[in-house]
Amino acid sequence: MKIIPCPSSPLLARRVAEAAGIEIGGAVFKKFPDGELYVRVMEKEGVVVGSINSNEDLIALIFALDVLENAKAVVPYMGYARQDKVFQEGEAVSIKIVAEMLESRADEVVTVNIHSSDAASHFSKLKNLDAMPLVGEYFAGKDVVMISPDKGSMERVKTAAKHAGCEWDYMEKRRIDATTVEITPKTIDVEGRDVVIVDDIISTGGTVAEAARILYGLGAKSVSAACVHAVLAENAAIKLFNAGIKDIIATDTVECAFSRISVAELIAENI
């Protein structure tokens, strides 16, 4: 099988090919004047690599998979995974539909840190890889404390901190009275410390920006942000820097200026 890079993951696809010792296959992706996509794949079988960070990314990935007689799908960032259940009557469960689209065309689907176990449950042929150890290794030897912006991401931060060899904590909401809620790290004093806020996805950046302001208010020396998937929608990077974030560190599941960590070898070992 050859690697077929989608337009959303050209660099990562080539890194995966190099790490796995697999050739790049021939494919053409272009757009017609009316905005419709044209996809041609000059292979009968292949591993299609493409993150879903937009509707166009999804269509390009599905079209490429549909051409192949024997296909694997590598979706480093699985978009639509946050709508993993019906929250209000009448809602489409987006990830369920995406799972059906992918698994009807691919023998296996490989992704990295899908947003939740509920999202993963909609797949029957999913291999969900964990890049948090790689995030942790990036900070190995640095005197930092890792903080989860909420209790829900606690296990992710725990994993990253283990591989960084550093302390970790999570932000805890504590109700003071009927109208006041205090948000602080549960146990660690961050005064004078270099703090790294760790999460799986940074999308609009609102949660991380608010956490940064709180941490600076508690005397943190510096606050950086680290994540697997740097979606960074709606000028999120500007929002984070305005909140005092010193640096943003991410993997290349979503290719951007902050992609310092590559998941290529992790993927290559699992295809």
Swiss-Prot record:
Q: What is the gene name?
A: prs2
Q: Which CDD domains match?
A: PRTases_typeI
Q: Which organism is it from?
A: Archaeoglobus fulgidus (strain ATCC 49558 / DSM 4304 / JCM 9628 / NBRC 100126 / VC-16)
Q: What chemistry does it catalyse, as a reaction equation?
A: D-ribose 5-phosphate + ATP = 5-phospho-alpha-D-ribose 1-diphosphate + AMP + H(+)
Q: What is its main location?
A: cytoplasm
- Answer yes or no on keyword Nucleotide-binding: yes
Query: Which residues bind ATP per the record?
Result: 34-36, 82-83
> What NCBIfam families is this protein classified in?
PRK00934.1 (NF002095), ribP_PPkin (TIGR01251)
Q: Pfam families per the record?
A: Pribosyltran, Pribosyltran_N
* UniProt-recorded name of the protein: Ribose-phosphate pyrophosphokinase 2
